[in-house]
A protein has these predicted regions:
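Alpha-helical segment of the N-proximal tetratricopeptide repeat
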Residues: 29-57, 68, 217
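Alpha-helical linker/edge segments of TPR/alpha-solenoid repeat scaffolds
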Residues: 76-84, 106-134, 177-223, 251-283, ...
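Bacterial signal peptide processing site
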Residues: 21-24
């Protein structure tokens, strides 16, 4: 029985060491997707006002909780609340990024997560999520007619994109080499933007929506040179998007980029004629669906040793379920349906992020199983059946997958077009 008391004391120490930020009954005995399910389903159903009422930043923490709150409030057209929440998450991200060294509390939290589950770790937003943070901050500034504020955010978003690309330069170059070996024709956008021609791998790392919106905002501010830079980047990411092609060719023609325009026309056909002073362009950006939420895969394995001592080894990992993308009605103009092209596939970005993290997740899972087993064996060795039983129950209840991600983002973004 003494070891049972010691085990209880060890568990108590782990919980206290983990700190208050991520410690909750939900994080101990459940996971984020389960806790956020009502909110997620309300957003999927388009019931944004209800989702806004249900959402609580306590579930996701200061960063992720405010990501969700900012996005839901934006969908509900509650722009002041959206801006406030996204600014709060932005400040929290800056604090996280500005830490020069690992603090004692962070080390304790990491130790706690190895004894419990990864939900006790501080949430580290993915690169694509940081890009969307600045995108929606920028759109909120546009709602206030603050073009300069929106431009500041797209510049920050572009810095995130550049850092993400450089961090994966080796993988992108490898993907580019594979495409060349398969005889795939060169992506002209990649050539013009000096980007790796990495096909779907590039679009899972770089956000065409961000680049295109950035180009539009620069064009609105009469900075066509900067707009052309981002249009070319968007073309590198989404080389078949008709709206991106049109905007890139329009900017090249307006700027007198003759060689670029020649290459563009050779690849895509004649550039569209310019607009006269009485005409304007209407750009439609269509956010569709809701990004997939991570789900938990779990298995409990009862195993007995030579002495007949039983143990339950629990494994829990996050995964994205394979579901077909829902179909949405085409945008219509004057009763005529407009064909649309994909500008961003957020599900692909989310899946790529999980793929990149999965090795680390599995390693931590293996270490956690080993650490928990050492405690269990100590209990079994000293003949403390109560301690052994308590540990098995604790292990089974607390082994939860880390399913945290920004779950209210769109599934994909499209641009209806009419050339």
């Amino acid at each position: 029985m003494k070891l049972g008391v010691k085990l209880f004391g060890l568990i108590s120490w782990v919980l206290m060491a983990s700190g208050c930020a991520n410690l909750s009954a939900g994080n101990l005995f459940s996971h984020y997707s389960d806790q956020n399910q009502e909110v997620y389903q309300a957003v999927v159903a388009g019931n944004y006002a209800n989702a806004e009422q249900l959402q609580s930043s306590d579930v996701g923490g200061e960063i992720l909780g405010n990501f969700e709150k900012g996005r839901i409030s934006f969908l509900a057209k509650d722009y002041p609340t959206s801006l406030k929440a996204l600014e709060e998450s932005d400040r929290a991200v800056r604090v996280q990024q500005d830490r020069a060294t690992i603090s004692v509390s962070e080390t304790a939290t990491s130790v706690g997560s190895l004894a419990v589950n990864d939900n006790l770790n501080e949430y580290q937003p993915a690169d694509y999520e940081l890009g969307f943070l600045h995108l929606y901050l920028g759109l909120n500034y546009l709602q206030k007619n603050d073009l300069e504020g929106a431009l500041v955010e797209v510049r920050r978003a572009n810095q995130v994109q550049e850092a993400a690309r450089k961090a994966r330069e080796k993988e992108l170059k490898s993907a580019e080499k594979d495409l060349k070996n398969q005889g795939m024709s060169a992506n002209l956008g990649s050539v013009l933007a000096s980007y790796p021609d990495a096909g779907k791998k590039l679009s899972a790392v770089q956000n065409g929506y961000l680049f295109y919106l950035s180009g539009l905002l620069y064009e609105a501010s009469r900075d066509l040179n900067s707009a052309y830079v981002d249009y070319r980047r968007a073309l590198a990411v989404m080389p078949d998007n008709k709206q991106v092609i049109e905007s890139t060719m329009y900017a090249a023609k307006k700027l007198g980029m003759r060689e670029d325009l020649r290459l563009l026309e050779k690849r895509y056909g004649k550039a569209p004629t310019g607009l006269n002073k009485s005409q304007g362009r209407v750009i439609v950006i269509d956010e569709q669906g809701v990004v997939e939420a991570l789900q938990g895969w779990r298995i409990d394995l009862p195993i007995f040793d030579s002495r007949g001592n039983g143990a339950i080894y629990s494994l829990a990992l996050p995964y994205y379920p394979k579901r077909g993308a829902p179909r949405f009605s085409d945008v219509a103009l004057n009763g005529t349906k407009l064909p649309s092209s994909t500008l961003a596939d957020v599900n692909a970005m989310a899946q790529n992020d999980l793929n990149e993290r999965l090795t680390t997740i599995v390693i931590r899972q293996a270490i956690r199983v080993w650490a928990k087993d050492r405690i269990r064996k100590e209990a079994a060795k000293k003949g403390d059946d109560v301690g052994n039983i308590l540990f098995n129950v604790w292990n089974t209840l607390t082994e939860q997958p880390d399913t945290r991600s920004w779950q209210t983002l769109p599934a994909q973004v499209k641009t209806p077009h009419k050339l």
